[in-house]
From Swiss-Prot:
NCBIfam families: PRK11649.1. Zn(2+) binds at H314. Residues 41-440 are periplasmic. The keyword Cell cycle does not apply. It is an enzyme of class 3 (hydrolase). Residues 1-20 are cytoplasmic. This is Murein DD-endopeptidase MepM. CDD domains: LysM, M23_peptidase. One of its GO terms (cellular component) is plasma membrane. Its cofactor is Zn(2+); Ca(2+). Zinc, although calcium also allows some activity. The gene is mepM.
């Protein structure tokens, strides 16, 4: 055997070097194949299943990434100071309103409020005309406590309103109502004696009409700071049927405070502008930071814990970012909350006008105080990891009329004005409305 081995070694050494390399490689490959034991699938084989017990923190580590523990129920809304104006803006509990504007579709409108895409598809199936919404039309809808759509109302025109109610089969049934009344313009005027709400009601405005006035003027006027003796004139178009008021629409408002006049005139697109056709809304930033950061947890009002099955809504968006990143106010407004609050950690809330509120949570340091006025882009805090948090991030929320919406898709205010033929038509309309807004 030794002689055979020496003969093989001698023959191997006498080979040219390239041949020796090739032969060696083939030898190694042959040995590898010889010791390899492949897994053979047998169709009828009984699988072996092992159950592994995990601790709760280990379970969480296997779940999709989230910046806040998903196995804990979210606390109730952090307290935001309320007043009687908020009651007028909020309207009926569970009812939300929206005026259709440029680029809107039924899907884009309802998606930002977290309404299920399946419901939107069912609505479109119930009435194909819902796919052709027009600028200035109004939608309103009712949700259950779990965020499920129960009813949608579409004001097609002053004369026609369509209602879509959920059926037992989880579809929607459409009914149409035609209004037969006569529309009449009414001027209601008065002087502020105490609160604006009480003064407006004394002048003959309904709660819904007071709400419409507050929304139209929200970017120009802080109604809480009106003084005794300030004057207002409101032009309403009201539908009368058999001597009763059926519905109304705000056409124009004039408010005089400390000797200065403020106007809001309705245009055909359903929005309000000043006498010159300039938009009243103050524009918002889309993101609360100077640069964009990775989203670690999305908006989901019906987020379900995959382990417990419990609904734990996530009412905002989480941005993963280094601690100490400057956090910016997305729009002009007033700081209404700046404090430390259990789950939210260091927390800031800003009110923009009367309809919009933004919230910023898990901060490391707060740079503003309650009552402070801020401008779009102002630094209000530094991001952190305080409160109930699994890592450094900013939790950011947008609320419209006390309803949380998706910050990434919500239709935010923009600074804009009318141009071209739209502006010419508006100026002609304003020329008729403004003279009617008299105080005498």
């Amino acid at each position: 055997m030794q002689q055979i081995a020496r003969s093989v070694a001698l023959a191997f050494n006498n080979l040219p070097r390239p041949h020796r390399v090739m032969l060696g490689s083939l030898t190694v490959l042959t040995l590898a194949v010889a010791v390899w034991r492949p897994y053979v699938y047998h169709r009828d084989a009984t699988p072996i299943v092992k159950t592994i017990e995990l601790e709760q923190n280990e379970i969480r580590s296997l779940l999709p990434e989230a910046s806040e523990p998903i196995d804990q129920a979210a606390q109730e809304d952090e307290a935001i100071p309320q007043d009687e104006l908020d009651d007028k803006i909020a309207g009926e509990a569970g009812v939300h309103e929206y005026v259709v504007s440029t680029g809107d579709t039924l899907s884009s409108i309802l998606n930002q409020y977290g309404i299920d895409m399946g419901d939107i598809t069912q609505l479109a199936a119930a009435d194909k005309e819902l796919r052709n919404l027009k600028i200035g039309q109004q939608l309103s809808w009712t949700l259950t406590a779990d965020g499920e759509l129960q009813r949608l109302t579409w004001e097609v025109s002053r004369r026609e309103t369509r209602t879509y109610d959920r059926t037992a089969a989880n579809g929607f049934k459409m009914t149409s109502e035609m209004q037969q009344g006569e529309w009449v313009n009414n001027l209601l005027k008065g002087t502020v004696g105490g609160s604006f709400v009480a003064s407006a009601r004394n002048a003959g405005l309904t709660s819904a009409e007071v709400s419409a006035v507050i929304k139209a003027m929200q970017w120009q006027m802080d109604f809480r700071k009106l003084k005794k003796g300030d004057e207002f004139a409101v032009l309403m178009s009201r539908e009368m049927l058999d001597g009763k008021r059926e519905q109304s629409q705000l056409l124009g408002v004039r408010l005089r405070s400390e000797g200065k006049d403020y106007y809001a005139i309705r245009a055909e697109d359903g929005k309000f502008y000043d006498r010159n056709g300039t938009g009243l809304a103050k524009g918002f930033l889309r993101f609360p930071t100077a640069k964009q950061f990775r989203i670690s947890s999305n908006f989901n009002p019906r987020r379900t814990n995959p382990v417990t099955g419990r609904v734990a809504p996530h009412r905002g968006v989480d941005f993963a970012m280094p601690q100490g990143t400057p956090v910016l106010s997305v729009g002009d407004g007033e700081v209404v909350v700046a404090k430390r609050s259990g789950a939210a950690g260091y927390y800031v809330a800003i009110r923009h006008g009367r309809s919009y509120t933004t919230r910023y949570m898990h901060l490391r340091k707060i740079l503003v105080k309650p009552g402070q006025k801020v401008k779009r882009g102002d630094r209000i805090a530094l991001s952190g990891n305080t409160g109930r948090s699994t890592g450094p991030h900013l939790h950011y929320e947008v609320w419209i009329n006390q309803q949380a919406v998706n910050p990434l898709t919500a239709k935010l205010p923009r600074t804009e004005g009318l141009t071209g033929s739209d502006r010419r038509e508006f100026l002609a309309q304003a020329k008729e409305i403004v003279p009617q807004l008299r105080f005498d």
